[in-house]
């Protein structure tokens, strides 16, 4: 998906910030694990609710959990088990950018998701 044909970083950023929600899906892609790359002949796929991902970067590196929410407006995903502890003891979900995770298990309930893949 191309949001803009411009090479200028400022125009690319502006296109990213002003992109409609139905086009933000392809920007929210994460790399696939080795087995999934071989199975689907793709390097990355858009993250969906129900996928299992492993965090590769940041303070939560190494944690594996299921995606519980995809925030297209903020370009972030919420992963179960990735929580911030607040001062009063409560835990809040910590949003992560999809480029910092790897999909280890796909939610295969959506048949349309794989209709164009080789398998």
UniProtKB/Swiss-Prot annotation:
Subunit structure: Part of the 50S ribosomal subunit.
Protein's gene: rpl24
Domain of life: Archaea
SMART domains found in the cross-reference section: KOW
Xref: PROSITE patterns: RIBOSOMAL_L24
A molecular function (GO) term: rRNA binding
Any one cellular-component term (Gene Ontology): large ribosomal subunit
Record organism: Methanococcus maripaludis (strain DSM 14266 / JCM 13030 / NBRC 101832 / S2 / LL)
Function comment: One of two assembly initiator proteins, it binds directly to the 5'-end of the 23S rRNA, where it nucleates assembly of the 50S subunit. Located at the polypeptide exit tunnel on the outside of the subunit.
Keywords: Ribonucleoprotein, Ribosomal protein, RNA-binding, rRNA-binding
InterPro entries: KOW, Rib_uL2_dom2, Ribosomal_uL24_CS, Ribosomal_uL24_euk/arc, Ribosomal_uL24_KOW, Translation_prot_SH3-like_sf
Transmembrane segments: none
BP GO annotations: translation
SUPFAM superfamilies in UniProt: Translation proteins SH3-like domain (SSF50104)
Name of protein: Large ribosomal subunit protein uL24
């Amino acid at each position: 998906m191309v949001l803009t044909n411009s090479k200028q970083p400022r125009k690319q950023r502006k296109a990213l910030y002003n992109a409609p929600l139905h086009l933000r899906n392809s920007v929210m892609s994460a790399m696939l694990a080795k087995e999934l790359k071989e199975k689907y002949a793709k390097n990355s796929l858009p993250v969906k609710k129900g996928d299992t991902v492993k965090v590769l970067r940041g303070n939560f590196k190494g944690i594996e959990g299921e995606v519980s929410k995809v925030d297209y407006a903020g370009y972030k995903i919420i992963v179960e088990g990735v929580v911030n502890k607040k001062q009063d003891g409560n835990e809040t979900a910590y949003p992560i950018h999809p480029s910092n995770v790897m999909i280890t298990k796909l939610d295969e309930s959506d048949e349309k998701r794989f209709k164009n893949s080789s398998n």
